[in-house]
């Protein structure tokens, strides 16, 4: 993996994972949006959001002797929204495509990351919802995992 130009770039962990997952879903013909997207959304689509959690305790000592957290717990939330009056298989297909992308995280997600490596990711919950007013089907799919900053990605100086 390449060396990051600076620490702020290296610590854009949530954005990096969201972008990698988004790229892979797009390759599977799944319309998706990052957590803070301002686009007008039309079903079917998937919202992608990553939240960084507690550091795992793995440290990296930089050139200034500062011990920096190098591994973090994270959660990946994917919200599928489909129109019930359209093709009913779309919702099921989106769920299956998401599971397939996540199942191959070692090769596909990590291959799309520049400075980070997903060490593990696990399905933690799926919750179906129904929006009666809009006739929308929604599923919230939750995954949890650990992401590491790659050893060779640390900047040369602070």
Regions of interest found by a model, annotated:
Residues 1-67, 105-113, 154-158:
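Small/polar-rich, solvent-exposed N-terminal microdomains that initiate assembly or binding
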Residues 7, 87-88:
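Short, surface-exposed loop/turn motifs that are enriched in glycine and acidic residues
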Residues 46, 99-148, 156-158:
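Acidic-leaning, charged glycine-interspersed low-complexity segments
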Residues 68-86, 136-151:
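Oligomerization/assembly interface segments of phage tail-like spikes and tubes
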Residues 89-94:
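Mid-chain, well-packed structural core segment of small domains
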């Amino acid at each position: 993996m390449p060396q990051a130009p600076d620490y702020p770039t290296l610590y854009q962990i949530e954005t990096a994972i969201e972008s990698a997952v988004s790229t892979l879903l797009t390759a599977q013909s799944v319309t998706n949006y990052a957590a803070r997207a301002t686009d007008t959304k039309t079903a079917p689509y998937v919202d992608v959001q990553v939240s960084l959690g507690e550091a795992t305790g793995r440290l990296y000592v930089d050139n200034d002797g500062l011990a920096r957290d190098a591994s973090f717990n994270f959660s990946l939330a994917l919200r599928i929204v489909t129109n019930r009056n359209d093709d009913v298989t779309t919702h099921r297909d989106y769920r299956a495509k998401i599971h397939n992308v996540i199942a191959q995280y070692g090769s596909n997600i990590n291959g799309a990351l520049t400075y980070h490596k997903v060490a593990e990711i696990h399905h933690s919950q799926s919750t179906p919802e129904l929006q009666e007013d809009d006739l929308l089907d929604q599923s919230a799919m939750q995954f949890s995992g650990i992401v590491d900053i790659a050893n060779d990605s640390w900047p040369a100086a602070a």
